[in-house]
C-alpha cells in the first residue's frame, strides 16, 4: 500500500527540452496558452503587521538530488544533512523518495531536522488535478489531503501541488474548472491545519501566468498561491518569462530556482531577484538543480548564487 501510494505522487518527468521540441510553436504561441491578460487587481496586503520589505530565504529542494535518490545512492536523511553542509535556511522535502508515510518514519525525519537546526520549508507531491473523470478528481483530492497530513507531521507549513497537462479532447477552461473545484476543497482542508498549498507552474495549463492567476483568484483562499518555478513559464508573443514571473510573484508561496531555461539560455538571476524584492516576497528561494553535473558538484554552485542574491536583496 505504501509503494502504491507513493507511486501516485510521482509524475513521469518529461525533459523540458524534449517537451518544447515535441510541442512546437503551436504550444508556445497557441491561442489557448497565450490567453489575453485578465484585469486582476493587485493582491491586497491584509496583514498590517507584515514587514514592508522582502525576506528572501535560502533553500534547496530534495529534487535537486533526484539522480542519486532515484537509484538509492542517497536517502532523505542524507538530504537533511546536506542542508547543513550547504548552510541554507530550509529544505523542501519532495515526497517521491519517502520510504513511507508511516508516522514513526515522518517523526524520525522531523527529529533529525530539529537536531541539526534544519527547517522544512515544505513538502511536494505530483498529483494532477486536471482529470476529466470525477472519480479521478476525487482520488486526487484525497491524495492531497493525505499529504497535507504528512506535511503537518513533518512540521512543514507548505505543500506543493500540480494542476497538470490537458487531456485529449478537453479545453483549457474545462481544466481550469476542474482544478479550481479540487483545490478549493483541498485548501479548505489544508487551511484548518495551517498548511498553505502552492500550485506549481509545471507542465500543462499552468505554464501560462494568466491561467495561474485565474486559478488563484477563483480558488480565493488565503491558504493558496503559486509555487513559482522561475524557468517553467512558456514565453508568448505578449509576455516573456520575466514578465510572467513579475505577474505572479505577488502570489508566490514558495520559489524554485534554476539558472537555465528549457532551451539552455541562462537565467538572469539578478533580474529575477529584483522582481521578488519589488514584490516584497517573503519566503524561500529553493535550488531545484537539474544540470548535467553530478548534484554533489552542481547543487553547491547553484546554492552559492542563491545565497549571494538573498544577501543582496533581502532584509535578512
Q: What feature does the model see in each segment?
A:
Residues 23-33, 45-50, 110-122, 129-226, ...:
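Active-site acidic/histidine proton-transfer and metal-coordination neighborhood
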Residues 101-107, 134-137, 171, 296-298:
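Metal-dependent catalytic neighborhoods of phosphoester/phosphodiester hydrolases
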Residues 65, 96-100, 128:
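Short active-site-proximal "capping" loops at secondary-structure junctions
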Residues 89, 157, 253:
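Receiver (REC) domain switch/active-site residues of two-component response regulators
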Residues 92-110, 166-169:
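Glycine-rich, proline-tolerant flexible connector loops at the mouths of alpha/beta enzymes
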Residues 2-86, 206-316:
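Histidine-acidic metal/acid-base catalytic patches
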Residues 74-76, 105-108, 137-144, 173-183, ...:
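Charged helix-capping and loop-helix junction motifs
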Residues 92, 122-124, 160, 256, ...:
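Conserved beta-strand positions in the central sheet of alpha/beta enzyme cores
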Amino acid at each position: 500500500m505504501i509503494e502504491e501510494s507513493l507511486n501516485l505522487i510521482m509524475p513521469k518527468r518529461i525533459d523540458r527540452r524534449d517537451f518544447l521540441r515535441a510541442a512546437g510553436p503551436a504550444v508556445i504561441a497557441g491561442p489557448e496558452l497565450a490567453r489575453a491578460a485578465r484585469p486582476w487587481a493587485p493582491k491586497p496586503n491584509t496583514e498590517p503587521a507584515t514587514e514592508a520589505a522582502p525576506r528572501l530565504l535560502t533553500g534547496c529542494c530534495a529534487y535537486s538530488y533526484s539522480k542519486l535518490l532515484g537509484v538509492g545512492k542517497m536517502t532523505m536523511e542524507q538530504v537533511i544533512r546536506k542542508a547543513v553542509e550547504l548552510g541554507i535556511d530550509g529544505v523542501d522535502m519532495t515526497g517521491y523518495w519517502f520510504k513511507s508515510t508511516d508516522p514513526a518514519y515522518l517523526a524520525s525525519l522531523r527529529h533529525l531536522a530539529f537536531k541539526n537546526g534544519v527547517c522544512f520549508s515544505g513538502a511536494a507531491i505530483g498529483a494532477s488535478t486536471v482529470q476529466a473523470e470525477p472519480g479521478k478528481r476525487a482520488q486526487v483530492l484525497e491524495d492531497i489531503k493525505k499529504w497535507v497530513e504528512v506535511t503537518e507531521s513533518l512540521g512543514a507549513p507548505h505543500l506543493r501541488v500540480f494542476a497538470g497537462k490537458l487531456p485529449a479532447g478537453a479545453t483549457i477552461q474545462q481544466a481550469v474548472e476542474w482544478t479550481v473545484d479540487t483545490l478549493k476543497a483541498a485548501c479548505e482542508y489544508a487551511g484548518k491545519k495551517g498548511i498553505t498549498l502552492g500550485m506549481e507552474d509545471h507542465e500543462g495549463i499552468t505554464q501560462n501566468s494568466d491561467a495561474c492567476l485565474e486559478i488563484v483568484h477563483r480558488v480565493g483562499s488565503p491558504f493558496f498561491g503559486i509555487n513559482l518555478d522561475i524557468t517553467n513559464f512558456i514565453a508568448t508573443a505578449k509576455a516573456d518569462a520575466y514578465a510572467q514571473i513579475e505577474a505572479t510573484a505577488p502570489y508566490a508561496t514558495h520559489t524554485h530556482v534554476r539558472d537555465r531555461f528549457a532551451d539552455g539560455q541562462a537565467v538572469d538571476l539578478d533580474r529575477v531577484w529584483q522582481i521578488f524584492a519589488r514584490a516584497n516576497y517573503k519566503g524561500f528561494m529553493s535550488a531545484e538543480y537539474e544540470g548535467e553535473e553530478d548534484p554533489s558538484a552542481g547543487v553547491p554552485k547553484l546554492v552559492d548564487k542563491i545565497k549571494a542574491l538573498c544577501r543582496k536583496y533581502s532584509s535578512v
